[in-house]
Amino acid sequence: MIPNMYKIAGELTSTVFHVSARSVAAQALSIFGDHSDVMATRQTCFALLASNNPQEVMDFALIAQAATLNARIPFIHFFDGFRTSHEVMKIEELTLDDMHAMIDDDLVIEHRKRALTPDMPVLRGTAQNPDQRQIGRASC
């Protein structure tokens, strides 16, 4: 996934990954929180946003979405994969009005306009063999 994250960040694509962080790549599988896998993605140019409790998970999810649309910087929103997901806590649910207040509709429309579509073809983020690259460089 990390190579794809470089491509997403390089194209300035508004993206949010919501990650329930657990220890997977260490010596033994553990259900308890370990952010080493998330920290392995620091060099991908994704912004990292950590939540500490269920209320923050919901609030920061909306904040991350609004921020990525505004800045066109991809985000990883992560939280403890066991403790936070199993914690019983009263939260104040976000309403649709809260979401509409945070998310600018014009930014959503602009994001959708940048989508790849056969009606408006555009070339972005290509991968080429050395011979094709040289032909392209020589033609400029």
Which role does the model predict for each range below?
Residues 75-139:
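Conformationally flexible catalytic loops at phosphate/diphosphate-handling active centers
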Residues 1-40, 46-69:
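Thiamine diphosphate
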Residues 38-42, 89-92:
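Metal-ion/cofactor- or nucleotide/acyl-coenzyme-handling active-site neighborhoods
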